[in-house]
Each structure stands twice: as C-alpha cells, then as structure tokens.
C-alpha cells in the first residue's frame, strides 16, 4: 500500500490489547539463546525487528520453534553459538544490531553484520571502541564508526571498559548482555550523561530473570561479578509495549475517550510508561492498574501545552510532538538528541511534517518547540513517514482533527504490523 487516507473522526473510545514490547522481545530472545536450558517465550512481538533477531539467531545455530499457540521455544546454547562464521542482515533493527555486535565480538568467530542504508548511517563507533578496549577485532567496512561491520576471532582480555553514554543506551545494554559470557569480573564506566536510562534498567531487569546480576553506582559505573552464567527461567512472558501504548492513550486524551490499553501498567519495567506523566501534565484524565492504563480528555476539554524533559521516554516523546497540535500554547520537548540517530533524523522529519499541518516549529540539536496554528489544522495533508514506523503511528492522530494521508503506512511492520486496524477499532472507522 503506497498510502492510507484516514478520515476525520470525532471520538476515540475502546480497549486495545498491546503487542509485546519490542525492546523486551529482542532482549529475551538473545538471552534465551545464550542461556543454559530451553526457554518458552510467550507474547513475543511479531514484527520486522523481532524477525531480524530470530533470523540471525537461527543462522547462528540456535534452535527456535514457533508453537501452534504462538509461543517460541528457544534452545539455549550455553553462551556459545554453534556457527562460527556467518553473514547477518539485520535491516534497520538497532535492538538486534547493537547487542549482537557485542556478543559476536566475544565468540571467537568470523561474522559480517549489515543492514539497510539507514542502518549504515546510524553510529556504532562508541560500542566498537569499547569492545576494542578488551581486545575485540572489529572492522568498519565502509566508514569508521558505522556499519557494516566485520568481526574477527580475537583474544578477549576482560577488565575495565569506558563508554560514552550520550548517543545511544543500546551500546551499554549490548555490553552488559555480552560481558557475562567472559566469566570474568568487568567494570563499565560511562563517560558523560547516560541517555535513555530506563532502557538500561530494562536490560538489567531482563538479565536478572536469567540469573545474572549487575551492580551499579548511579548511572556511571556498572560492575559484573565473575563466574555468572545465563540460565533459562523455563517460561517467560513479554509485557505489552509501552511505546505503542502512547498512541492510543494520546487518542483518548485528544478525542474524549475513555481508551484503555491492556498489557502494561503500573507494574511495567519500561521507561515509556512514564508517558502518562506528560499526559497528566497536559490535563488528561488518567487511571491505572497493574497491567492497564486508561485515558480520557481533560474535564475542560482542551489539552495544555507543556515543557517536558523527554530523556526517560525517547520513543513515546514523539507522540507528544503530534499531541502538541491539539494543545493550547507552545509545547517544548527537551533532551531528544537521540532522535537524530534513530530510524530517521526524527527531529528534522517531525519538524517538516508538523509544518505541513500549519504548526510553527523551532528545532534545535536536542529540542523541539511546537506551536499549533491559530485556526484549524491543514486538512488532507500528505505525511511522509521516512521508513519510520513511529512517524506513521504518530501522525495517525491528526485524523482526530482533520482528514490526513499517510504515505508508506506499511512501515509500521517494524514494530506493530496491525497498528492501523487497532487504531480503526477505537476510532470506529472502517479499515
């Protein structure tokens, strides 16, 4: 489908069962593959990103079977992939590319990792430099600091590692998941401010489910004790994706509600669950249980503009940018520098598409300032999505004010293949 025309809808109301979290799904797949024992994974996200991880693990010799009831049985390889030479194509899946780079660098094998052109523009130099500190031999095949990569057999000498924290938390997460494979004590020191800290906390939580503990001092120093090995918990469930919840919760706040999402709530280990704090600041009515959240429009009807630090919700923060179109006043989103190195340059892309709708936008290195138009949004705008799933999902919210065309709606397959069907269900429109 080249485009999707969304009609103007008056109200959003209903319940949505969330797909599994992308971030948790790919972490659990990798840890299950590295563990001793067999793991049965339920509610795994079925998407392009998780498909890339599944394909890669199978190429590396991991036995993975999808059962008739939609679960995945992963036979762990006790920390050593059977296949020692492979070429892996990982699309634009950062949650597969970064941790696999770290793990494969310790495997004493010969591997090539590549992706789509955009992945080759996304920096990985800080992770490569950190791995080289302990003896890894990694060649950047086109431009230093960027994929594609070639990994060679190497003598690994675990010890202290320093890594920058200001580009992507996935670099640190990859190191944390990989280094227990050495069996040696390792200390990782983060230089500068660590962005997206909740995603690191998420990594540590998943590692604990497989029996490996990480000690930390603030967000600057992480210690991995010696002689730890991953052990299967037997059965493990993936909680619903909190980033994906943001679109439906936003719809409820914009267009009446109530909209309830099921599969993530107050017990969630995901940082993006804090999106509800921004909704509350905008005046939305929020209620929450252990595994559900419900949103509705403010009692007065109109959302308020906010000035919000988005460091803890880098993905869900994109939803706030489109919500700003419905708020009174100027909304400022801060600490979003990581948007520049995501599936597209999200600061530039979001700025361009918001302007098509009549918004006034000021963009900086790490912030966006958005003022909605004085009158109605521009109807029938054609929104480009830049092969970025979150751009497509964010701008679906525009239909709560005016008709809108979304180009390349199929890009949502990266994390949420049936998103538009779920959106149509709560807006009571045909799809």
Swiss-Prot record:
Organism of derivation: Nitrosomonas europaea (strain ATCC 19718 / CIP 103999 / KCTC 2705 / NBRC 14298)
GO cellular component, one term: cytoplasm
InterPro entries associated with the record: Enolpyruvate_Tfrase_dom (IPR001986), Enolpyruvate_Tfrase_sf (IPR036968), EPSP_synthase (IPR006264), EPSP_synthase_CS (IPR023193), RNA3'P_cycl/enolpyr_Trfase_a/b (IPR013792)
Gene expressing this chain: aroA
Physiological role: Catalyzes the transfer of the enolpyruvyl moiety of phosphoenolpyruvate (PEP) to the 5-hydroxyl of shikimate-3-phosphate (S3P) to produce enolpyruvyl shikimate-3-phosphate and inorganic phosphate.
Binding site for phosphoenolpyruvate: 22, 94, 122, 170, 346, 390, 414
One Pfam family from the record: EPSP_synthase
Top-rank taxon, per record: Bacteria
Molecular function in Gene Ontology: 3-phosphoshikimate 1-carboxyvinyltransferase activity
Disulfide bond listed as a keyword: no
Keywords: Amino-acid biosynthesis, Aromatic amino acid biosynthesis, Cytoplasm, Transferase
Lineage: Bacteria, Pseudomonadati, Pseudomonadota, Betaproteobacteria, Nitrosomonadales
Protein's cellular compartments: Cytoplasm
Binding residue positions for 3-phosphoshikimate: 22-23, 27, 168-170, 196, 315, 342
Subunit field text: Monomer.
UniProt GO BP: amino acid biosynthetic process; aromatic amino acid family biosynthetic process; chorismate biosynthetic process
Name this polypeptide is given: 3-phosphoshikimate 1-carboxyvinyltransferase
Catalytic activity, EC: 2.5.1.19
Pathway connected to this protein: Metabolic intermediate biosynthesis; chorismate biosynthesis; chorismate from D-erythrose 4-phosphate and phosphoenolpyruvate: step 6/7
Residues the record marks as active site: 315
Recorded family membership: Belongs to the EPSP synthase family.
Catalytic reaction equation(s): 3-phosphoshikimate + phosphoenolpyruvate = 5-O-(1-carboxyvinyl)-3-phosphoshikimate + phosphate
């Amino acid at each position: 489908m080249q485009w999707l025309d969304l009609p103007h809808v008056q109200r959003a109301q209903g319940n949505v069962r969330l797909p599994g979290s992308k971030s948790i799904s790919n972490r659990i797949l990798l840890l299950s593959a590295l563990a001793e024992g067999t793991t049965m994974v339920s509610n795994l996200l079925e998407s392009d990103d998780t498909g890339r991880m599944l394909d890669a693990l199978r190429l590396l010799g991991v036995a993975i079977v999808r059962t008739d009831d939609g679960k995945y049985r992963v036979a762990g390889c006790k920390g050593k992939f059977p296949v020692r030479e492979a070429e892996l194509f990982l699309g634009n899946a950062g949650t597969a590319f970064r941790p696999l780079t770290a793990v494969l660098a310790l495997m004493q094998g010969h591997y090539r990792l590549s992706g789509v052109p955009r992945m080759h523009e996304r920096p990985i130099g800080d992770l490569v430099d950190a791995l080289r500190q302990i003896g890894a031999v990694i060649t950047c095949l086109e431009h230093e600091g960027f994929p594609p990569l070639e990994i060679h057999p190497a003598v690994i000498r675990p010890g202290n590692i320093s890594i920058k924290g200001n580009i992507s938390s996935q670099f640190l997460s990859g190191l944390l998941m990989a280094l227990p494979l050495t069996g040696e004590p390792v200390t990782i020191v983060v230089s500068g401010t660590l962005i997206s800290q909740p995603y690191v906390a998420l990594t540590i939580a998943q590692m604990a489910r497989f029996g490996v503990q990480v000690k930390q001092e603030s967000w600057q120093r992480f210690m991995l004790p010696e002689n730890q090995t991953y052990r299967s918990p037997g059965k493990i469930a993936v909680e619903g994706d909190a980033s994906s919840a943001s679109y439906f919760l936003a719809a409820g706040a914009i267009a009446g509600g109530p909209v309830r999402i099921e599969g993530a709530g107050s017990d969630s280990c995901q940082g993006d669950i804090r999106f509800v704090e921004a909704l509350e600041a905008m005046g939305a009515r929020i209620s929450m249980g252990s595994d559900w959240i419900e949103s509705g429009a403010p009692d007065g009807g109109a959302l308020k503009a906010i000035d919000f630090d988005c460091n803890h919700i880098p993905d869900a923060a994109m939803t706030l940018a489109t919500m700003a179109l419905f708020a009174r006043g100027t909304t400022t989103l801060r600490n979003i520098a990581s948007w520049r190195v995501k599936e597209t340059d999200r600061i530039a892309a979001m700025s361009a598409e918001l302007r098509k709708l009549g918004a006034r936008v000021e963009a900086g290195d790490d912030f966006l300032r958005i003022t909605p138009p004085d009158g109605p949004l521009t109807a029938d705008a054609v929104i480009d999505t830049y092969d970025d799933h979150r751009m497509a999902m964010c701008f679906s919210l525009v239909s709560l004010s005016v008709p809108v065309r979304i180009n390349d709606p199929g890009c949502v397959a990266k994390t949420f293949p049936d998103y538009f069907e779920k959106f149509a269900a709560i807006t009571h429109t045909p799809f």
